[in-house]
Design a protein with these regions (language model features):
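N-terminal low-complexity, intrinsically disordered segments
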Residues: 1-42, 67-68, 72-74, 80-82
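Amphipathic protein-protein interaction modules
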Residues: 42-94
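Short acidic DE-rich linear segments
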Residues: 4, 8, 90-105
């Protein structure tokens, strides 16, 4: 797995979560809260965009922290992340670049 593939997997997981939150076929706590807010006048599209942006920023921040480019909590250190074949995914800046492309553009 490359750093770019790792970032794409994080994005895919975010998309699955977002779809689940807005699904009419699955009941989740977040989905119930979304439905309550919609019943009080917010639009589904506006909520979807808001939650999408929140998840994008959270995923981006976490990936930046894993790559040593931002703090995680109040600590900024470089982490080493390896795939199952012991290839290092961090340290080269590839996560930072791929994360920006996937979550911030």
């Amino acid at each position: 797995m490359t750093a770019e593939e790792f970032v794409k997997a994080v994005k895919a997981e975010k998309e699955v979560s977002l779809e689940l939150y807005f699904s009419k076929h699955h009941e989740t706590l977040i989905g119930n809260l979304i439905n309550d807010i919609i019943e009080n006048g917010a639009t589904r599209d506006n909520l979807h965009e808001l939650i999408n942006q929140v998840l994008n920023e959270n995923c981006y921040s976490l990936l930046m922290a894993l790559d040593g480019e931002a703090s995680l909590g109040d600590t900024q250190i470089s982490y080493k992340l390896f795939d199952e074949e012991e290839n290092e995914l961090t340290g080269s800046g590839e996560i930072e670049s791929a994360a920006y492309e996937q979550f911030m553009q």
